[in-house]
Every structure is written in C-alpha cells, then in structure tokens.
C-alpha cells in the first residue's frame, strides 16, 4: 500500500522522495537511508539521504513563502488545515500500514494514530482562529503617573520558519502536533522525520500537499542525523525548534542559539500506590500505562512505588493480567510487539541483566527473540539497580516497595526526569498533596500517565523538557507579541 495509488508520486524505484518547493524530489547525493522493519529485521523502505545544500534550498524557499503565508487570512489557513485533516483520515489505511512496518505499532493502534492526527489538525484550525483572532487593548493610565494618552494594541505574529523533529513512536501524531500550530499561526515549517517512521511522515506530508498549501511552505527533509542533524538545528534560517525525543534534545538545546525551544525529552514516570487504592483499578492502569505499545511511550509508567502492605496483592493482580497479554507481530494486533531496533532491545536486556545480578525478583521468565521482548514485571527492585532510574522504553516494569508516601515522592523527585506521574488513592486530599509534591509536569490521579487529549497542556520538568505543548500552548509558543502604541495629544477618557 505504501507509495501506491494517490501516493505514487512520492516514490521512484524503491526509494521514497523528499518534499521541497512543493515537489517530490530525488536527492543529488544519490544515496539513501534504509529503514529496518523491527519485526523482520530486514530493510523495509528506503528514503533519500538529503544534502546540506538541499536543506539550504528548503530553508531559503520557506523564508520567502512564509512572508506571503503570514498575509493569508486566518479563515483561509483554517480551511486548508481542515482539508488536510480530511485527506489524512481518508488515507488512514496506507499511513497506518507504514507505521506497522516501520515501527511495529499494532495495526489497530496505527489507524487510531492517524485518525487522532486528523482530529488534532482540525482542532488546531479552530483554536487558531479563536486564539489569533483576538488582540489586546491597553491604556496608559493604569500605571501610576500616566494620563490616558497612550493606547496599546497587541497582536500575535508568526515567528518565521519552524523546525519540527518528531520521534519514532508517534511519528505522524507528534509531527502534526507541530505542523498544525505552526501553519495556523502563519509560519512555514521544515520537518525532519525520524528514520523509523519517515515513510509514514512522507505519506502524511503528501496529504498537506494534496490539500493545496503554498509550494515551499512545508518541507520534509529525510537523511542521516549525523550528516544533516546539526546543520538543521543550527541553521540560521530556523526561528523555532519543536523537538520530541530523547536526550539528543539536550544537545540540540545547547547548540540552537537564540531561538525559542519546545522540547519533550522522555521520562521515568512514577506510579505511587497508597494503601487505600483500588488495586483492581491500579492493575488495569499498570497494564495500560506500562505495556501498551510495548512500553515505548514517554508517558508510560516506568516505575511502580507501592506501599509494602499492599504490594503482594498488587503484584499478584498485575501478574495475572500480564499472563493474558498477547505477544507477536503488529499485523496481528498483538499487545506486545517488537521494540523499534536491535540496539533498543540490547539496551533493555542490559537493564534486565543488571537487575538480575543485583537480586530483583523476576515475576516472569525473561524471554527475547530478535527485537521481540516478552512483558516482564520486576519485583523488589532496589535503588542501586539501573532499572530504578533509567528509561527502558520497552515492556519491562520495575516495582519498588515503599513504607511511606514520602519515600515514593523522594524517589520520584530524585530522578533527573520529570515528565508525568500518577498517584492511586481514594483520599483526594492526599492525592492533591502528593501531586503538588511530585516534581513532574503532569500528575494523573487514579489513572495512568497519558499525553492528551491533545489540547491539554503537556510539559516536562528537569531533563524532561523545555516549554509546554498541547494545541493552545504550541500556537502561543510559535508566535510572538507585536505592539503598536497610539499616542494622543491630550488625555482621552471614554464617555468622559
């Protein structure tokens, strides 16, 4: 399905083209980058290895086209976004097929990601019209010592060219979460997709192409991060960077210079379970929060901090549910599918071996076939184990037994991450106090961590990020304030 039908223009031979100047192009490098299917561990797709000169050309065009796009009426911008959203949903099957083959996301979840992405784009259109359609009016005499001789008019104007870098795990959804706000705000956008997920992104970008956006307003540049990564993030034509991924973002933030940054860099999301918690509810949320998409989510539960008095019961309930998880290929909608790469699988295995050497209790036998790792609950994990602190990004979940809520809070806050967390208790007063004490961007009460709905604020503290996402916050972040002051010859008071 990939590269066929309406998508025939985006591929030549067995290599997908990149998108620039409103056209699908082959790179002058003559080189390509292979995309490995996580399930078969064989080359599934190839994409262009773009050059630095091709990056320059995309940036140059984006700068020019953005000036005109900024003068396009808000209603027209919104109209085109709604059209792109409809096309995206119409072709959800082809894009979902790419996700299945590139990142081993279960087929049903892949379709859900595309539909959710269409909804996000439409919401951006609506929210942008509301948000950007209003300005602010200030008068000077509210500040001491001033008469009403100055009228201040403020509005939000675009930043210019946005560089968007989404991660492999939600390449389409986390691309449009940057594209939608950028475009409705009047910006141009250059997309650097992840290698795993690049073809899904190219298919998604073609939907925007079919919607009729101005040529050059959107570019999708594929290639090796080692060759064009730093060149893109340090490019003088970039006016803002929106990045979702791992600790690469820290290096980007140090090199980016004087441009606004929106960064989400992973987490070690803690789940604190008190004695009065509904343990059946906890167990269900642990499965959903810890093992969906094989734990390859920034907002996955990464460590359970459970009170000693209820730990045995909770572990028993979770183990019963783990036993029912299906393991296999994404085409079969298995609960647990292969992790994205061999290097990821090796990293996860290293955490497992460390835990075993240091005495963790294995609730299941550790099993791995290629990139496929069976779900594993590790009980009696201690703070000296790597799994207590590091983000596995896989179906491995540690349980640390605690004797007080304060102990759980301390472990959460001792982490260098601070993305999300959750607390389970029937006492809302305790829940609020614990939420306030946890140094994380979002705390869920009686539910697993989650990104969304997509209009909710989404942010990380500490090494988990810079700034806040969510549709409204992203639109605001991709604009700046412009002020015009009208100076009157004498004070003027309404109806005075």
UniProtKB/Swiss-Prot annotation:
Annotated protein name in UniProt: NADP-dependent glyceraldehyde-3-phosphate dehydrogenase
Induction statement: By salt stress.
Biological role: Important as a means of generating NADPH for biosynthetic reactions. May be a main source of cytosolic NADPH for mannitol biosynthesis in leaves.
Taxonomic lineage from the root: Eukaryota, Viridiplantae, Streptophyta, Embryophyta, Tracheophyta
GO cellular component term, pick one: cytosol
InterPro entries: Ald_DH/histidinol_DH (IPR016161), Ald_DH_C (IPR016163), Ald_DH_CS_CYS (IPR016160), Ald_DH_CS_GLU (IPR029510), Ald_DH_N (IPR016162), Aldehyde_DH_dom (IPR015590), ALDH-related_metabolic_enz (IPR051020)
Pfam families registered for this protein in UniProt: Aldedh (PF00171)
Catalytic activity line of the entry: D-glyceraldehyde 3-phosphate + NADP(+) + H2O = (2R)-3-phosphoglycerate + NADPH + 2 H(+)
Family: Belongs to the aldehyde dehydrogenase family.
Localization annotation: Cytoplasm, Cytosol
Residues reported to bind substrate: 116, 169-170, 297-299, 451
GO molecular function: glyceraldehyde-3-phosphate dehydrogenase (NADP+) (non-phosphorylating) activity; lactaldehyde dehydrogenase (NAD+) activity
Activity regulation, free text: Competitive inhibition by NADPH, 3-phospho-D-glycerate and ATP.
EC number: 1.2.1.9
Record bears the keyword Cytoplasm: yes
Species in which this protein is naturally found: Apium graveolens
Residues noted as binding NADP(+) in the record, renumbered to the chain: 192, 195, 230, 391
UniProt-annotated site: Transition state stabilizer, residues: 169
Binding positions for NAD(+) per the UniProt entry: 245-249
Record-annotated active site: 264, 298
Keywords: Cytoplasm, NADP, Oxidoreductase, Stress response
């Amino acid at each position: 399905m990939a590269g066929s039908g309406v998508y025939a223009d985006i591929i030549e031979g067995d290599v997908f083209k990149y998108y620039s100047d409103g056209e699908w192009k082959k790179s002058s490098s003559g080189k390509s980058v292979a995309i490995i299917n996580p399930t078969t561990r064989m080359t599934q797709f190839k994409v262009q290895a773009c050059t630095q000169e091709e990056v320059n050309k995309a940036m140059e065009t984006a700068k020019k086209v953005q000036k005109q796009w900024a003068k396009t009426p808000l209603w027209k911008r919104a109209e085109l976004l709604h059209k792109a959203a409809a096309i995206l949903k119409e072709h959800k099957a082809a894009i979902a097929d790419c996700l299945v083959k590139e990142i081993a996301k279960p087929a049903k979840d892949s379709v859900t990601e595309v539909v959710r992405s269409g909804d996000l784009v439409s919401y951006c259109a609506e929210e942008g019209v509301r948000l950007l359609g209003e300005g602010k009016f200030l008068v000077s005499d509210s500040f001491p010592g001033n008469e009403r001789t100055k009228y201040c008019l403020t509005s939000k104007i675009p930043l210019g060219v946005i560089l968007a870098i989404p991660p492999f795990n939600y390449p389409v959804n986390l691309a449009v979460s940057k594209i939608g706000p950028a475009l409705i705000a009047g910006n141009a956008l250059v997309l650097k997709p992840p290698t795993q997920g690049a073809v899904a992104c190219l298919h998604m970008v073609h939907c925007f192409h079919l919607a009729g956006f101005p040529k050059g307003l959107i570019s999708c540049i594929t290639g090796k991060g080692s060759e064009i990564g730093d060149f893109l993030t340090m490019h003088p034509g970039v006016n803002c960077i929106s990045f979702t991924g791992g600790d690469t973002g820290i290096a980007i933030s140090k090199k980016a210079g004087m441009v606004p940054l929106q960064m989400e860099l992973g987490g070690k999301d803690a789940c604190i379970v008190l004695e009065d918690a509904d343990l059946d509810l906890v167990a269900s949320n642990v499965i959903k929060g810890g093992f969906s998409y094989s734990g390859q989510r920034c907002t996955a539960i990464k460590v359970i901090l459970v009170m000693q008095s209820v730990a045995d019961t909770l572990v028993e309930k979770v183990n019963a549910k783990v036993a029912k998880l299906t393991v296999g290929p994404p085409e079969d909608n298995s609960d647990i599918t292969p992790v994205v790469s061999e290097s990821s699988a090796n990293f996860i295995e290293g955490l497992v071996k460390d835990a075993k050497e240091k005495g963790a209790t294995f609730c299941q036998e550790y099993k791995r076939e290629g990139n496929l790792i069976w779900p594993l609950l590790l009980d009696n994990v201690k703070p000296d184990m790597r799994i207590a602190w590091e983000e596995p990004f896989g179906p491995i979940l540690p349980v640390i037994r605690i004797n007080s809520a304060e102990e759980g809070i301390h472990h959460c806050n001792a982490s260098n991450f601070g993305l999300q967390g959750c607390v389970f208790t029937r006492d809302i007063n305790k829940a609020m106090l614990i939420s306030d004490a946890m140094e994380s961007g979002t705390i869920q009460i009686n539910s697993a961590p989650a990104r969304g709905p997509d209009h909710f604020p989404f942010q990380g503290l500490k090494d988990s990020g810079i700034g806040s996402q969510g549709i409204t916050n992203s639109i605001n972040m991709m604009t700046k304030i412009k002020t015009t002051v009208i100076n009157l010859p004498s004070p003027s008071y309404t109806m005075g």
